[in-house]
A protein has these predicted regions:
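Eukaryotic scaffold repeat domains enriched in small/polar residues
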Residues: 4-368
Length: 368
């Protein structure tokens, strides 16, 4: 790549402030941001050659030569907000001497209700499955970055940088407890790259590789802190990891491991067909279909006028073969976020899209 092109891509990456898995420290694991050394925003960047994603994934690698034709458009708006602190608004912060922020994360609970982490306004914003506001819940930690809601309505909110703890909030909105992040398996808060719940167990992903069980949804910490080989997926049956094999060539790889017994199911190498700068989603729906979000540089992009998008891939749960892909617009404003895409239990994703006028929640299907 010519130096002028490299500089152009570096500048462009600065604009993609919403990539879920970016932050300023490159560590071994399973996610890679290209170009190497580019300024980054929030969640963890990791090396594709690190051991975290491959230590327990021994097995054959299947290589795909291409993907189904991309579906474009077709998103259905669920809710729209303005920027601000009042009702119907979500917070945005653009300080002179710190990273700008927008809502860090969103998730969906067992009832289909949407929870948005509006940390600038120190609250969770709750919507029904049709996008109607249901109220807010105070956030009791100082630097919240991720949220997960369990089947019984317990909300888990992660602060990995200041309090370095997971706040456990009951269905009544009152805090039930707090789980420390630091301990066996997690020596630094910044190494935490995702928050996950599996039944009553609470896991924190380390450097996009293994996940550490830090406690339970009752607020009780786990002293032993055992590890599992990847992030617990939403199907209840799979651990997942992903990595970028060759960013400029658009080659990525996904590994699935069965939970019981803990054995390798597949490793699938996929050719996206466009340069890949980062990954911003990895999960499975209730049926087991796996979703991988890739941030790509679009055809016609130049150093002077870079153009980016998100290619959302859906993969077969048994062997990882591509079932379809959908092209989404990339968020290019400078705000930091942590999880801008969340997989719906019934299939498809919700995307927290940002504009200068305000953010909106959009539902997308994957493929045709």
């Amino acid at each position: 790549m010519k130096r002028s092109t490299q500089l152009g891509v570096v500048v462009a990456v600065l604009l993609i402030g919403a990539s879920v898995w970016w932050f300023s420290r490159a560590q071994p694991g399973s996610i890679e941001l290209l170009p190497e050394g580019a300024p980054t925003v929030d969640s963890g960047v990791a090396s594709a050659t690190g051991s975290g994603a491959t230590r327990k994934t021994t097995g054959a690698v299947t290589i795909d030569g291409g993907l189904p034709e991309a579906r474009t458009g077709g998103g259905v708006e669920l809710a729209r907000f303005g920027w601000g602190s009042g009702e119907g608004n979500l917070g945005r912060s653009r300080p002179d001497e710190a990273n700008p922020e927008a809502p860090m994360s969103l998730t969906v609970d067992a009832l289909g209700q949407v929870w948005i982490l509006d940390q600038v306004n120190e609250r969770l914003v709750k919507l029904d499955r049709n996008g109607k506001p249901l109220g807010t819940v105070p956030v009791p930690v100082q630097a919240a970055q991720d949220v997960v809601v369990t089947a019984d309505g317990t909300a888990l909110v992660m602060d990995r940088l200041v309090d370095k703890a997971i706040a456990v909030i009951g269905p009544d909105g009152k805090q039930k407890g707090e789980l420390p992040i630091l301990g066996k398996g997690l020596e630094e808060g910044g190494a935490s790259t995702g928050l996950f719940a599996d039944g009553k167990d609470v896991y924190v992903e380390r450097e996009h590789g293994d996940s550490v069980k830090i406690g339970s949804t009752s607020g009780e910490a786990n002293r032993d802190r055992p590890e599992v080989p990847g992030r617990p997926a939403g199907d209840g049956r799979t651990y997942l990891t992903a990595n970028i094999v060759d960013g400029p060539s658009g080659v990525v790889m996904v590994t699935a491991i069965d939970r019981q017994p803990q054995q390798h199911r597949f490793t699938r190498q996929l050719v996206v067909g466009l340069p890949v700068l980062g990954l911003n989603a990895l999960d499975a729906d209730r049926s087991g279909v796996i979703y991988l979000g890739t941030i790509v540089e679009l055809p016609g992009s130049t150093p002077e006028l870079p153009q980016f998008g998100i290619t959302l891939l859906c993969l077969d749960p048994l062997d990882g073969r591509p079932l379809g892909q959908t092209r989404l617009p990339a968020n290019t404003s400078p705000e930091e976020t942590f999880r801008e895409l969340t997989v719906l239990p019934e299939g498809g994703v919700l995307y927290l899209e940002r504009t200068e006028q305000g953010p909106r929640v959009v539902r997308y299907a994957c493929g045709s």
